[in-house]
A protein has these predicted regions:
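Conserved lysine of the Walker
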Residues: 13
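A basic- and aromatic-enriched beta-loop-alpha substructure that forms the phosphate/nucleotide-
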Residues: 58-101
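A glycine- and Lys/Arg-enriched "phosphate-lid" helix/loop adjacent to the NTP-binding pocket
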Residues: 86, 90-161, 172-175, 179
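Conserved substrate/cofactor phosphate-moiety recognition/catalytic segment
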Residues: 21-63
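Hydrophobic positions on the alpha1 helix immediately C-terminal to the Walker A/P-loop
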Residues: 16, 20
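Walker A (P-loop) ATP-phosphate-binding motif of ABC ATPase nucleotide-binding domains
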Residues: 2
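Hydrophobic anchor at the beta1->P-loop junction of P-loop NTPases
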Residues: 5
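Walker A (P-loop) phosphate-binding loop of P-loop NTPases
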Residues: 10
Length: 180
């Protein structure tokens, strides 16, 4: 099973992936080549994303998925949906060169690549189990920004749960998004 973990910054995604692998050692972590590209090319992230960086990250996320096959036991710390959410935020805020045309170029790639994911676990911000925000590597620590990203994920997750529709995934062949 190919599992993706998604959500805003500082919500415990990597911790969940690490704990999951300890509990179920037959699962492997994806290559996460996008992290290497971010570091190697010093790509802009979070509030400073731009088309060039988001395009490179999206393609790395897709490449990692394409290296797998149906039946592989792999867990992804982030997926193309994450990339699209961050791009949507930037387009909405008009904080960079990311525009509607760029979003429209990305959506078909996200739709196609998400078909290869069997299930998406979304880790939302909750009052019941708050996660301490820690400065680490390229992590964003602006609480308002983190909440705004979380809200975009929640709209996607709740809309899909209520209507069965998600404009960023194909209708007939998409993974469920399960909020945990």
């Amino acid at each position: 099973m190919r599992i993706a973990i998604c959500g805003s910054a500082c919500q415990g995604k990597t911790t969940l992936v690490n704990d999951f692998i300890k509990q179920w050692p037959k699962y492997k972590r994806s290559e996460e080549s996008y992290r290497k590209v971010i570091k190697k090319e010093n790509l802009k992230l979070n509030k400073e994303v731009d088309q060039d960086g988001q395009w490179k990250i999206l393609n790395c996320l897709i490449d990692d998925i394409q290296k797998t096959e149906k039946g592989d036991n792999i867990i992804f710390d982030r997926c193309p949906l994450d990339n699209l959410v961050y791009s949507l935020w930037s387009e909405e805020k008009q904080s960079s060169d990311i525009d509607k045309k760029f979003i429209e170029k990305c959506i078909p790639l996200v739709q196609e690549s998400m078909r290869a994911i069997d299930i998406v676990f979304f880790i939302p911000i909750t009052k019941a189990a708050p996660v301490k925000i820690e400065l680490k590597n390229t992590r964003e620590i602006d609480e308002e920004y983190i909440k705004e990203i979380d809200n975009i994920f929640k709209v996607i997750s709740h809309t899909m749960a209520a209507t069965g529709v998600c404009p960023f995934m194909t209708k007939d062949d998409r993974p469920p998004i399960i909020e945990i």
